């Protein structure tokens, strides 16, 4: 089963400095049919104006993955971590028993991100933050694991959930496949381009909620950049 959630039908808010679209209920947007997808709780499509951002605020008991689509995001937190994550790269914050952080666009142009929240397997624990570059060339033609709670994914950023965040770049006409296990929930968004997911068309920034599909086959109709979450 694949349910398409068109970009134009997503919830959202325009705060001037922040233009946000919500694939699931978040802040002032509430849809009882879209409270999450398995352990995937939030997928926000954010556009952050230059020299603005989110001031310090708290989180707890959530795995927060930020995928930078354009520009760069600068992170600061109460543990003393600081870092700048550029387009195509990923940062992960395990909020654990509590952390405060801020995220700023210190760039001269708009920064565009996907922010993804996944519920952890267990509450509590020491909070942490990390970031890693993932060159788009390394993802050409196949899925690469960007963040994972599985020990076998040694090159991915670690998260505290039985979940994966994967990325791929596909030239028009190319295909990539991913095996989705029994009882798993997949959610796929094309950051750019246009794709077919098991024969169902998705335009850029549409979402596809995937369930009871043993294999996810993605064919690019245009040059495309894809993010997929595999969650319990």
Predicted segments, located by residue:
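Jelly-roll (double-stranded beta-helix
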Residues: 1-232
């Amino acid at each position: 089963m694949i349910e398409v959630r068109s970009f134009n039908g997503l919830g959202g808010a325009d705060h001037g400095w922040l233009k946000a679209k919500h694939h699931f209920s978040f802040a002032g947007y509430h849809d009882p049919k879209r409270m999450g997808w398995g352990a995937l709780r939030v997928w926000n499509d954010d556009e952050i104006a230059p020299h603005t951002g989110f001031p310090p605020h708290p989180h707890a008991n959530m795995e927060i993955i930020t995928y930078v689509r354009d520009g760069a995001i600068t992170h600061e937190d109460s543990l003393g971590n600081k870092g700048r994550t550029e387009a195509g790269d990923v940062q992960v914050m395990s909020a654990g028993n509590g952390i405060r952080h801020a995220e700023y666009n210190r760039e001269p142009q708009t920064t565009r991100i996907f922010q993804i929240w996944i519920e952890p397997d267990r509450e509590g624990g020491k909070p942490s933050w990390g970031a890693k570059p993932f060159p788009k060339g390394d993802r050409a033609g196949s899925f690469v694991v960007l963040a994972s709670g599985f020990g076998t994914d040694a090159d991915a950023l670690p998260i505290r959930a039985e979940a994966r965040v994967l990325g791929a770049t596909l030239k028009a006409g190319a295909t990539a496949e991913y095996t989705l296990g029994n009882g798993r929930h997949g959610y796929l968004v094309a950051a750019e381009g246009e794709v077919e997911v098991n024969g169902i068309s998705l335009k850029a920034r549409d979402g596809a909620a995937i369930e009871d599909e043993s294999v996810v086959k993605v064919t690019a109709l245009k040059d495309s950049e894809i993010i997929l979450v595999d969650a319990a």
